[in-house]
Amino acid sequence: MRVLRVKPGDLGEQFASDITDDLRHMFVAKASGQVVAYGRVIELAADEAGPGTPAGCYLSGVLVDPAWRRRSIATQLTQVRLRWAFARTDKVFYVTGADNVASLDLHAAFGFQEMKRFRSERSAAGEDVLSQLARAAERS
């Protein structure tokens, strides 16, 4: 399996809306020539991810094909995205629903620390969690 960064047009229309500008970066995991998972890094302005959220690089949207789950693909995608983001910045953020235990656990394993919680209509729990990872913590 390979994890690689893709650009607009690399995957046709399937992901065109996810990589519309220089602030959205798509990474895919391919097996047997087929995309089996993807994740993004999005550069956001202050408050764009939620009230009181900082500007910066945010990990976003890991999705793994159900037939390919439980193979550490989300972990591999996260490693590659972090390496890419830390080549550009000292801190990486992510926001997820407070009820998204799989995402919270995945990111905690990399050392992400919760910064704050805030009300959100995007999450079924009605609450999102903002977490941060500093470059030094990622390398330990």
Enumerate the language-model features and the residues they cover.
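A short, internal acetyl-CoA/4′-phosphopantetheine-binding micro-motif in the GNAT/acyltransferase core
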Residues: L59-R69, T96-G97
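Conserved beta-strand-loop-alpha-helix junction that forms the acyl-donor binding cleft
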Residues: Y94-L104, E121-S123
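A conserved beta-turn-beta hairpin within the catalytic core of GNAT-like acetyltransferases
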Residues: L44-L59, R69, R88-D90
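Short amphipathic alpha-helix that is part of the acyltransferase structural core
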Residues: M1-K30
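C-terminal "cap" of GNAT-fold acetyltransferases
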Residues: S120-S140
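Conserved beta-strand in the GNAT
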Residues: V28, Q34-A45, Y58-L63
